[in-house]
Curated annotation (Swiss-Prot):
SUPFAM superfamilies: C-terminal domain of RNA polymerase alpha subunit, Insert subdomain of RNA polymerase alpha subunit, RBP11-like subunits of RNA polymerase. It comes from Dechloromonas aromatica (strain RCB). It catalyses: RNA(n) + a ribonucleoside 5'-triphosphate = RNA(n+1) + diphosphate. Keywords: DNA-directed RNA polymerase, Nucleotidyltransferase, Transcription, Transferase. This is DNA-directed RNA polymerase subunit alpha. The keyword RNA-binding does not apply.
Length: 324
């Protein structure tokens, strides 16, 4: 198949505004492509990013959300709203049950929640409630992994729902805000081109640049089916080497895995990220000394880069790739 001949962006500028906000500028695009791609990326970022949110809460002495708690200034509705503002990040797990017990006058903050070693709170200073003298607040919080927005009344909670548990609407998305703008760009004598500017802010669970990379990969995966409509492999124009994503050419050491996990992979001749993503979970679990904990670690670091296990790569390994 012949090349489309359309311009591809050659200038990509990432402007970090803060650790959770960035502006990404890409140019040049053919006229109209700025809006086409900008809108697609924005919708994917808002709807398809994986995040974590509290989904169920139990508060001592509370049977329904319209109650009050003695010694707590806020009512239960306000407590639940404040709890939704806590930003959780789970490592190596999809669900966790946490406890919070606080007594005495003062503010109850997110940092007062008891955490296991593989759970992190991004905003520990976030205020959940205020206690009066002699007040006490004790609660259990269920945090789950998900994507998008899921109302509490549509989740399948089964028949084992405990009386007194309050079900929350869950907003899993780690994207607080994303907007795009299209400006004019120029290449030599052409002035009818687009410049795409994506302004993104996250809650800290994922970096802005990684979020855009992930959204781009989702878009590519969804569109790939249209490229295969003919069902036959296109005839190569010439013996040009296949283009390989530079990320796949990076050694697995760049994933910053534990020494144990890294050594297990190298023992199986897995030296590059491209080698790793083609292995399935079952294949990795058969690796000596690599258990479920190491597998979860590998899956998490790959997911942060928009990659998964069991992916299929054509023309791998590329010519000239050296094995360490």
């Amino acid at each position: 198949m012949q090349s489309s001949g359309l311009l591809k962006p050659r200038i990509i500028d990432v402007q970090s505004v803060s650790p959770v906000q960035a502006k990404v500028v890409m140019e040049p695009f053919e006229r109209g492509y700025g809006h086409t791609l900008g809108n697609a990326l924005r919708r994917i970022l808002l709807s398809s990013m994986v995040g974590y949110a509290p989904t169920e809460v139990g508060i001592d002495g509370v049977l329904h959300e319209y109650s009050t708690v003695d010694g707590v200034q806020e009512d239960v509705v306000d407590i639940l709203l404040n709890l939704k503002g806590v930003v959780f990040k789970l490592h190596n797990r999809d669900v966790v049950n946490l406890k919070l017990v606080k007594e005495g006058e003062g503010a109850v903050r997110a940092g007062d929640i008891e955490l296991p070693h593989d759970v992190e709170i991004i905003n520990p200073e976030h205020v959940i409630a205020h206690l009066s003298p002699g007040g006490k607040l004790a609660m259990e919080i269920k945090v789950e992994k998900g994507r998008g927005y899921v109302p509490g009344n549509v989740r399948n909670l089964g028949d084992a729902k405990t009386i007194g548990k309050l079900v929350l609407d869950a907003s899993f998305s780690p994207i607080r805000r994303v907007a795009y703008a299209v400006e004019s760009a120029r290449v030599e004598q052409r002035t009818d081109l687009d410049k795409l500017i994506v302004d993104i802010e996250t809650n800290g669970v994922v970096e802005p640049e990684e979020a855009i990379r992930y959204a781009a990969r989702v878009l590519m995966e969804q569109l790939s089916v249209f490229a295969d409509l003919e069902g036959t492999a296109p005839v190569a124009e010439a013996s040009k080497p296949a283009q390989v994503d530079p990320v796949l050419l990076r050694p697995v050491d760049d994933l910053e895995l534990t020494v144990r996990s890294a050594n297990c992979l190298k023992a199986e001749n897995i030296y590059y990220i491209g080698d790793l993503i083609q292995r399935t979970e079952n294949e990795l679990l058969k690796t000596p000394n690599l258990g479920r904990k190491s597998l979860n670690e590998i899956k998490e670091v790959l997911a942060a880069r928009g990659l998964t296990l069991g992916m299929k790569l054509e023309n791998w390994p590329p010519a000239g790739l050296e094995k360490a």
